[in-house]
């Protein structure tokens, strides 16, 4: 349902500035209405009669009549009209149509009154403070302690104290005090007075609104609409405003569309902090407490407790006969302290606890009627007059008021308004700042920032909400009914309280309780006699024994000497637990009971000294734990164990308990665990038979008969063994209760036991040193450290607080036996030995030599364990955290979902999340051979750890897992089949960082130092390995790993992809003999990088279609291995770029310098080499076929072809060689070529041919002799004439280097066309060349042509020179000549 306001002005607030503006308009008539928008109730200090105020936080609107703001709630279309004249007035007229807002009367229902009511109610809450006196009634609970005093005959009155127990119920009444606040809530009922708002009928005056009919004309002006959520497009007219009351977003309709203008919320709220003024409403919150006052009615139940006179039910106290054991309870004289319970008489005040009825005082909340002042809300009734405003419907005729549209408009914009914009009376809102302007006399005058101030009022509105809670306080009225005691009927249920009725008598008896204590003294006197009769030595000594506890320690000290034997005592740390054994010394108090001497026999239990190993074992079972200390033969714990020796006496004393069967032994027993000695007290029950003589109590003497049973109590000495059965004996006492009401007095004997009428809830102190609570749901046990839980024989535990009641389980500190053996369900364990095996368990810490364990679903474990300690959490969602040393283990075992380990484990320790730990995490440090492990199947697990000489690993099938860590001489491993996993870290000193086989898409990033390894296993597709490997470190991708990538830096290390890897990328830096390598049998892989100082970048053997790209510097090597096909090597080298042997169809491209080389090894087929060599070599090795070599060589470079059918071309300077033709059938083309293979050809400048069947065609050889010894060779040497002789390019003469003959054909051509052929022979004897000219043709010369113009014709004569040979020219004329010497050398 959307709410509509049709007003002349919107979204404007009034503050002091508005007051100033009102001064500017003070001459306007009251008929001029204005509309304001704000947060909270409008202040009466602004506005004029007829003005409209919209509270945007509540959707209420107010109209000012008679200088009072009247509240309305608009559920429909509300129109308010003002006079046509003035500013904003016409649109206000539409507001008159708001008379439909009569529905707003709902709002009138005391909303305002609620606020006032709340304040009044708060005053009532003050009365509730008196209820605090009812707390004194809690002292009445102390009166219950007085019941123990009932052991005195006077204790009968103590039963009245039971009524005091009902007073406890009265404590519930204390809660009722809060109910008194509820009384204030009653004022909220005055909010009902808000209903009086119906008086708004008086609002008939709204007929004035009829004038508003004229305002109907204003309808064409603007409408302010509101609703929940974004406005509907079909809602409203252009120029209308819409307020989203959920978001406080303000919209304006422009051209049929709703446009967001600004948000009225936000910053205003900050100012709203001022709203703290609404604190008065907070008192109304106290009224909320008044609801609790209803519970105070239960306090009335305490009244029913008066009925509790039937408290005769105290018969259940017959169990109190067990209280006869309470005679031993003479110790119960301490109950004399209960005398203080006399103060408990104040517990009568506890009756005041029924002051829950004081919630009745909440009736004072009637003062809340002052909230009737809220009836001012009745003025809101005037708003009802708006109902008459419905007559405004007639105003519909006033549509003519549309002319009034010229009245005022609400404009919006970003920034200051344009002075040419709008008309006088219009409103402009700057949507950037929330500042609102009004146009006056042609000027835009700033009025207020819409944001902010409203927020202040909004705070007040919040307080009003609290007042609504005060309405809840009405329930406090029900508390008044509680006075009627109707609620008290519920108290009837408190029949248990009937005993409490008796307690009423006890109220008087409370004072008597002091007497009761005295009576206890009387009984105590008798008891003294009885004690003596009983072998009171036990009792008397036992008392002294308490003092003797210290002395007992001295005795134990002697045994401590034996502890000296416990040199193993170094384990003495455990011995500290032995100090707890000193608590056993308290047992020694019993030792003062001469029986303690028997405890000395306990000393004979030097075998217990063996317990010294378990020094705690000396303490008796604790020493056994000491045996665990044997595990700590580190013996330090044993030292403490010496103290345990003292405890051993105590332990033997426990055995002494069994000795209780020997009455004397009873003395010793009591001395040891004197508490068990209390069981000996059962023997005292036999004594109680004597007391049966005392049977004055035996007035219930029937009980004395039971005393006969006490005779059996002697047998009961045997019963000492049945100490555990002692509780059962109490059951026997219950039988005594059957004997009669006198048993009620036995209830006073409850000095050792108090039982609730429900027969389920029992409080017992019958066992010395133990307070035992038995409850249907909740049990809290506080153990001094002298007894059970859960015996055999606890072995150095105790010291705890236990809550179980069918394994809701709770315990706090120390424990064992073995730490209470598998407690389980909903468990909590804290401090020292802890353990909580079970679902929902919680375990805390410090288990120095044992296990800290929370074995269960949702478990939590923390702690510190040393000396082979273990921290374990087995279960889903478990957390194990701690510090575990000396071969310790921190472990969350199988199938623990979302588990976490956080710990520090050293000395061979292990931290591991076992198999199936999905989403698990290990954070910590595992040192010295330790193992950190997340088991297999651990999906998305995380390990962040440091391991020294240890192992960090995630098991197989653990997808998406991560390891971040450091391993020194250890291993960081993600096992096989771990897809999408990641390792980041450092391994050093032979450490390993590995991802196992079949781990697809995995990522390894790290640093491997000192022979360490970073590797991804075989068959790991799409994985990546990045890192630094130095000092023989290795970064490696396993065999058959497709599409993987390795990148890194290696110093004397190795970066490599395994063999059989396809499409893998390997790039990096290898120095100091480092290697970047694809291991072989790689397909389509890429290797790139930089290698220096004997580093290598290599493609392994049997690789296909692989690319090797890099720089080999300072003796580095770039190499493609043997038997590879279709590979590409591209690089730069001051070392070697090499294509291994038996490569097919591969390509080498590169640059080599400084004695470097680019090489294609032998037996390669169809190889292409292309390079640049500076003082280096480019060559193909022998045995290669069909190789092509192209290159350029400088500074002594050599470009050589040694393969069959190869082709080489290039350039070398004079100091170098290009392409020595080293293989048969090869061809070299270039400069400074040499053919040294048969049937090959060398062509170029300075070409040479050395082998048979080969040929060199040389142009102007520059140095050396183009001929070489051997079989016949064909060489062409080009020469030119220098003056009259033919010389080589360097001016020297051709020579024959070896002895032998050279048959020469010289073909000479002149520049003018002369051509001649000469034949001659040269012989070289090793020092001198000799030329022989044949006779045919004459002179060996044939002249083919000599142009007529050349005359005389030149002639040519072969001659010998020094050294070598030449041809001289006669009549050269002006021609220049070249000569080609074709030489067949026969050597």
Swiss-Prot record:
Sites where a glycan is attached: 6, 794, 814, 819, 826, 846, 886, 894, 969, 1032, 1077, 1123, 1200, 1224, 1232-1233
Identification of the protein by name: Collagen-like protein 6
Biological role: May participate in the formation of a layer of cross-linked glycosylated fibrils at the viral surface thus giving it a hairy-like appearance.
Keyword terms of this UniProt record: Collagen, Glycoprotein, Hydroxylation, Repeat, Virion
PTMs per UniProt: May be hydroxylated on lysine by the viral-encoded procollagen-lysine,2-oxoglutarate 5-dioxygenase.
Residue ranges, annotated region (Disordered): 98-219, 268-422, 454-753
Species this chain originates from: Acanthamoeba polyphaga mimivirus
Record keyword Mitochondrion present: no
Compositional bias ranges of the Basic and acidic residues kind: 114-181, 189-199, 207-219, 268-340, 364-382, 390-405, 454-535, 544-747
InterPro entries reported in the protein's UniProt record: Collagen, Collagen_Structural_Proteins
Intracellular or extracellular location(s): Virion
GO CC entries: virion component
Domain named Collagen-like: residues: 95-154, 161-220, 266-325, 344-403, 450-508, 512-751
